[in-house]
Amino acid sequence: MKKNFLLIVCLHFLMTLAAQQADKYILLKPDRVFDGVQMQTGWVVLVKNNTIEQAGAMTFKLPAGTQIIELKGQTLLPGLIEGHSHLFLHPYNETSWDDQVLKESRAERTARAVNHAKATLLAGFTTVRDLGTEGAMYDDAGLKKAIEKGVIPGPRMIIATRAIVARGAYGPKSENPDVDLPQGAEEVAGLEELSKAIRSQIGHGADLIKVYADYRYGPNGESQPTFSEIEMGWLVGNTVSSGRKAVAHASTPEGMKRAINAGVSSIEHGDDGTEEVFKLMKEKGVALCPTLAAGEAVEQYRGWKKGIDPEPSRIVNKRKTFQLALQAGVTICMGGDAGVYAHGDNAREMELMVDYGMKPLEVLRAATAVNADVFGYANKIGRIKKGLAADIIAVEGDPLADIKNIRHIKLVIKDGTIYKK
């Protein structure tokens, strides 16, 4: 009996020792830590496997075998979160949107998306909210799975799959009425088709549902609302009942109001929002993802020489409406519509947010804790906090002193794995 007891004790000790030896610890020692809310000094961060084990002053004992990474002159931050991305698109000055949808095979588009995912991760963005494959069907679900399995490097993906548009509202447009072209999103007409599209996209892996609440649908190509209030309410109700969030592409005041009143979690773009609309967003707790970088990129593709030519009316108007949103106290997400411009250049949006009137501290919050909160992932990412996922980056210098320092990536850790050092 005594021998059996000793054997059990020895086995338990050996198993515990083996488990401890299997654990991987990394201690990060930067000059400062942005925890997702505030900049902290005198902090270190201990990572255990894929989780943040400790964050704060060095008051704890290091486990044996801990890897220590000195980050002198550097700032540690939560992995950045891109709030509006299209990994299956590439810059429109390389290939037009129509030609990407119509002429590039899905195999080519997926191959490009693999490269885009890696570039995004190495730029310090460890999570992306990818808001539609733009004609590549459900291939974002496969890309997401390949990243999760470790087949390819890339960020965590929050995916919308195909997105939903009103029949006849989107593109590409056919010049021959007898020819139906492939579309950049799933077309629907009426409540029954709405329900079918929502459930189909969820069944294929959608983490959220994206709807185009307005588009260039008017008789002269101007933006107009594309769904009625009843249809918008139906879409959001069906989405929310599945435990998911609905988000809306919207730029017109009426399209924005219909989406806000229906209960979407965020408005994407919001170019022509008014003081009234932004007050409604604040009241309803709806966030704005402004996509400043996409607008600037498109104007530059059209010939605008930034810093030399006067700002086009689109940019002047965007500055004005962004200020209205800030003054109304609307929650601002960080999302630039990457894909319109190069993946890996995601920090461009953060720089423009400062240029358009936000403080660097608010921009850092938007790209970390705020995005995590709005997207429903605050229990996992967006902060440097004990128990959260070890998605951590380090940049040279202090991004509060100069937001451009966010580009100087020195370290990228996602889920405890070092991808750049």
Regions found by a protein language model. Name each.
Residues 193-288, 312-331:
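Histidine/acidic residue-rich metal-binding segments in metalloenzymes
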Residues 88-109, 167-182, 218-228, 284-315:
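Active-site gating loops and adjacent loop-to-helix segments of metal-dependent hydrolytic enzymes
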Residues 91-93, 140, 169, 220, ...:
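Histidine/acidic-residue-rich catalytic or RNA/ligand-binding cores of hydrolases
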Residues 114-138, 154-163, 206-217, 245, ...:
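Divalent metal-dependent hydrolysis catalytic cores, especially in the metallo-beta-lactamase
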Residues 99-101, 241, 314-399:
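His/Asp/Glu-enriched, well-ordered alpha-helical/loop segment
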Residues 23, 37-77:
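Histidine-rich, glycine-flanked metal-binding segment
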